[in-house]
Structure formats: structure tokens, C-alpha cells
Amino acid sequence: LLFIAALGLTVAVGADQKLKRPNILYIIVDDQSPFDFKFYNQRSQLDAPVIEKLAAEGMVIDGAYQMGAWVGGVCTASRHMIMSGRTVWHIPDRPFRKPPANPNALNPKLVPPDLVRNTLAAVFNRAGYDTMRTCKRGNSYDDANKQFTVVHDATKRGGTAETGSAWHAERVLDYLGEREKAKDEDPFLIYFGFSHPHDVRDGTPELLEKYGAVNHRDKDTLPPANSKQPNLPINWLPEHPFHHGHPGLRDAVKVPGVWERRDERTIRNEIGRQFACSEYIDQQIGRVLAKLKAMGELDNTYIVYTADHGMAIGRHGLQGKQNLYEHTWRVPFVVKGPGIKPGSRAQGNVYLLDTLATLCGLAGIKPPTTNEGLSLKPVLMGRAQTIRDTLFGVYCGGTKPGMRSVRRGDWKLIKYDVMDGTVRKTQLFNLKENPNEFIREHHGLRKFVKPNRNALNLADNPKFADKRKEMEELLLKEMRRLNDPHRLWDQPKN
């Protein structure tokens, strides 16, 4: 009898443990710089109380990056990396593009033909999780998205509940309501994606009014000035000092409300629109978190907040996401959940491609053998500050070989080899002393406090010649390690 009782106790405990497997709510927005938020940028005027509360109750990662892209739609490469856990040169392209924008995409030694079987939802399905997603359509890893058991995708960038971000929240709320009604106790992975604040940034009338912005449609006029509009970014420029390397790029010339303008009125209005869309997203996240709390699931749920890449909107005289400055290469990254110390911060040095390994680690699932990412769990649990010491970035969606970046510690190198060799530039920044990556052109502006005289591109300063050489050698090493098919003008061809 004692043996039977003990056996029954073991079974009961085992079942209870199974019920307590953590849920995951992965929130991802489209086109958002980390510097939109006060917890990354004290100058920001965005109100995002729900996300700010997540940051206060969880961990903020100061060094979260997306590795880059080989196509103008940066989100395509970014979302392939998120879903697969693989590096930028080891992922497929969308099937319609022939030849693929990634020259390695059809090489089975670098991109496994059956990769989709080992993408995020497929892995969690096999582990007994219920999987659901809502997000925008297009510029994504379509076959991986289909692995989610429940899929509600649509592009919603309007200013009403039906045409905007509330639509995505409703899909999640409906899903949670159905689980509650069915008394479904399986753990869940919800990929809670938004179409905003990617343009067209049509906010709700109330939030547009709050930020002094209008949905400007007339290409021949400037939007009205309004004192409520957010201030210009501290590293705003009226134009970038040299060509970014992608002629005719949509984000540089065709975004409604901005087009090719970088003047103060246009940029402040567009940031107001960005903030209106972002605060509306914040409200929708709050609705979902309230539902989880009412269901008794909130404390057993890991919540991740991030974006598929950053965004310029006037910073350095740029508009889109096709650059490697920190405002665009970096992404916001906040995690709250069991075992994470409230109000904590860490450098992290995490890529978005580490999502698969990280979520597997938090859920106690073994990552697939195709995964190349690292788990952020040691950092989230307070056992480490970073998971790697070197970060690599690429953009070559325009002229080749494009831009490359590498960061280690406080030092960052960016190299440009674009426009068929007519633009070849090197930038070297000490991010501790120059976190806004000020360049010479910033020193002549009167909009802001004049930058420190040493807050410059140091690439041509003889005092830093050794550091430049060191970083260039590190960049080449990373390009080789990651199977980058291109080489810059001053690199060996192998």
C-alpha cells in the first residue's frame, strides 16, 4: 500500500510539473529603434507605460542586434533568422526571388534543405506546446510561419481598431479566450506580431493629436509645424554626408509623408506618427497582459518585447533601416518572467537569431542541430553579462559589396564599399565616448548642444591607427567565419 501511494504521489507530482511548464509571449513590432524608449534614451518623448513596466519588472538588454540583410526589405532576412536560429548567410530567401538575394541560399551545405522542420513553431509543436501567431503578411519566412498551429496574419497599418494594431491584439485575445473556454492546460507559445510602427504610420486621431502629428499626404507641401511634436533626434542631420549605396531605395525616397525630405518639420511630424503608432501598440499589449493576469497565467509566462530591426527617421540624415548605425542595427529587447530579477540590465550582446536558442532554453527544450544561435538564458538568470564578445553586421541590399560592421567592447567599425567602388568609407567609433555616433557634420549644427570635440569618426585619426587595423582584422575574421560571399576593396579576396 505504501508503494502504491508513493507511486501515485510520483505521478501526481509529475503531472503538476508538466502543467507548470512556462508559457511564452513573444512580442515583435516592425521598424522600431531602441532609442524610441525612455529606458534607452532619456530624451525620448514616447509614452509607453506598459512596455516601460515590463522593463521595470524584467531585464533590459542594452546590446541586442539584428545581424543584417542582403535585401532592401531588411525584415525578410531578420525574420528568417528569428525563425531558424541561423546566421545571415545561412538562411533561405523567399522562393519567388530568382536568383536569391542571398548567394548562399541554394547551397545545401550552408542552408539545410529541410530547415523548415527545425524552425521555431515546429520545434515547440514537437515539445508539446500549443503554438499561435499573428503578424503582418510578407517579407517573412512563409514556410516557417505555417508551422504554427493557429495563424492569423494580415498587414494592419491603419488608424482604426479594425485596420490597425488592435486587430492583432484581438486575435491573441480570441485565442486565449478559446483556450480558457476549452480548459486547455498545455503550455503555449504565442508569436504576437504587429504591422506597425512600419510605414504607412497612420495613427489613431487621438494619439496623432497628442503628438502633434498629421497623416501628411501632399508631396508638394510640408506638414504643419506643431509644438507638441517630438523633438528631433540628437543625431539628426539634414542629409547623410555620402551616398548610402542603394539608389532608388523605397525607404529613402517613397515613404508617404517623408519621401526624400529630411527637414525639421517633416522629421518631427513623422516621429510623431511613429510615436502615435507605438503608443497604440503599447495599449494593445496591455490588453493582452491583463487577460493573462485574469487567467492566472501571467506569472508563469516569459514575455519578450523586441523589433525586427531598428529605424533611422532622420538620424544621420537617413530615413529607413538600411544602415548599420546603432539606431538601426540595434533593437529594443526586454524580457520578463520567472527567475528574471526585476529592474535588471545587461549588455547581452545578443542577436535576434538567438531567439530560438533562448526560448528553447527558457522552456527546457533541446534546440535543433540546425540552430546556430546562443541562448541568452545565462544572462537573463543573472549568471553572465554577455553571451559573445564580438558582433557582426551587414547590409548589401543595394550595390555590392555594401556595408559591414563589427563591434567589440566599446569599439565599433563600419565600412562602406558601394556605388561600384565610387564610395569607399571607413568609420571608427568609441561608443563609450560617442554613443550617438556623431560625425563631423553634427558639430556644425546649432539645433543641439555641441558634441564633445572628440565625439567623431576616428578612422582617419593617426592616434587610432592601431585600433582601426585591429578592428578591420576582426571584421575580416567574422566575414570568413560566417561565409560572407563578398569582400571589401581593401580586403584579400579569400
Placement of each model-derived feature along the sequence:
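Bacterial N-terminal signal peptides
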Residues: 1-10
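Bacterial Sec-dependent signal peptides at the C-terminal "C-region" and cleavage site
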Residues: 9-20
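Active-site segment of extracytoplasmic enzymes that catalyze sulfate/phosphate-ester chemistry
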Residues: 15, 26-27, 33-119, 123-135, ...
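Active-site-proximal cap/lid insertion segments
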Residues: 18-22, 29-45, 53, 62, ...
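Short, solvent-exposed turn/loop segments enriched in Gly/Ser/Thr/Pro and often Arg
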Residues: 40-44, 60-86, 94-95, 133-144, ...
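Polar, surface-exposed loop/tail segments
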Residues: 48, 82, 136, 299-304, ...
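Short, solvent-exposed loop/turn segments at the edges of secondary structure
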Residues: 75-77, 143, 326-330, 371, ...
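Low-complexity, glycine/alanine/valine/leucine- and proline-rich hydrophobic stretches
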Residues: 409-427, 431-433
